[in-house]
Amino acid sequence: MSAPAVLLGVDIVEADRLAAAVGRGGHLLARHVATAAERSLGAGPVAVSVKESLIKAVGGRPPGFTWHDFEAVKEPPAAWARPLLDEAACELADSTGLPLTGGAAYRVRGASARAALLRLAAPENAPEKAPATAAGSSSPGGAPRSRTVAAAARWGEGGGVFVSLAIVYLAEKGNACP
């Protein structure tokens, strides 16, 4: 069995520059970038940088994109995704000298989910226009799998720099993860 495909995005930005942008934007920026559920967690530099890394992972801002395409969730990422994210975070920490101590799982929907599905699907299975949730092939029991897109991110700040790392992957229900 082959390993699942993932998309990777990294954002490295000067912390002062990011804090100034968030400070200038205030509540309007918070509403623009973060969903209502996320605003209760705080929509500061973390939300902006992590969402920038998620945007990079899906290949940019597709037509119809909104910042709300990505939403932090309380559920943990897929069990197989956690070690992959940890390893990538360790590599990035080694190269930047900055440990990535924060983390969260994300729901991916809308235009960004469709863009990710197109990039993650095998070329022979990729529909011309994939919906955010698409019926996939059958699971071993014969029931169709639901293909949704999920993500996980890690971040850290220090030495005047803010770093975030995100992976985006298919979360297929009705199929055991490798």
Which residue stretches match the model-derived regions?
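Core catalytic alpha/beta fold that binds nucleotide/phospho-ligands
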Residues: 1-178
